[in-house]
Amino acid sequence: GHMDYGKKDPSLGWRFTDAWLSMAGAGDKGLPNGLPVDEWGIRVEDCHPAGSSVTRGGAVNGPAAVYALNKYIDWLGDYAPPAASGMTFGEAGPVPAQGQIAQQIFWYTAFTASMAEEGTPVVNDDGTPKWRMAPSPHGPYWEDGMKVGYQDIGSWTFFEHADPMQRKAAWLYAQFPTSKVVSLKQFHEGLTPIRQSDIMHESMTERAPKLGGLVEFYRSPDREMWTDTGTNVPDYPRLAQLWWSNVAAAVTGEVSPQEAMDNLAQEQDRVMGRLHRAGVQGDC
């Protein structure tokens, strides 16, 4: 009935950092996201991280976060296929299109193309889907105004330390794939929009009945409550690796969900403390 994944793998980390805790009610209300606490449980003061543990005003080991981990483990064990606990994100992603899954709670719009492919068990003969995207559910600690999910902002990054001429060339190239003509074609192929004009284009209105609610979602103001990873996270790679290792320990039963999140809180605070002492974050 339910599809998920639970293998000890980096993808288990973004299963949680991509806003699972916020759906349970971890993090503060309002936009921009994460003021003062975000979905990683990290609290900021004067735009600098001040801690993620409850004792430091954070939320990564608070009641909502522990509830979120418990609910994930319960659903994985009670409703997902037996093999799901040993799958990675990449292995679990194609399974719903095989037609044996009732819901997939952790859903990226990047899955839409395979789920809308004609001739698959999840698409009707007329090309309309047998499934529908639904608003993210939220847990008992959630309050109106909190975020309810994650979406990548799809930004381009140009490094200051790169060769100046190469950086200029990269900037020029970026103008092409983000141009209106190209971005609309990309939206039709990958179904991950970057422009409002693409979302509102008449060609997407024509395709909307075959995309299971994708177009309607992006035309709705509610999309603002699905936000990107905010600026509270000072070192994404270094902190992200802490998540999948600690979550995996709870999945296998090595530790309880509360212990897993307590350990994560301590490790995150330790890393952020080192970053603070190193003075690498600069001024606001």
Which functions belong to the PLM regions below?
Residues M3-S53, G145-F159, R238-A248:
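Periplasmic solute-binding protein
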Residues M23-G86, S136:
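Glycine-centered hinge/linker elements that transmit conformational signals in sensory
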Residues Y67-K71, M165-P177, S256-N263:
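Short amphipathic alpha-helical coupling segments at ligand-binding clamshell hinges
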Residues P82-Q98:
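Short helix-initiation/N-cap motifs at beta->coil->alpha
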Residues A97-W107:
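Alpha-to-beta junction loops
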Residues T109-D125, P140-S245, H276-C284:
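C-terminal lobe and pocket-closing loops
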Residues P129-Y141:
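A structural supersecondary motif
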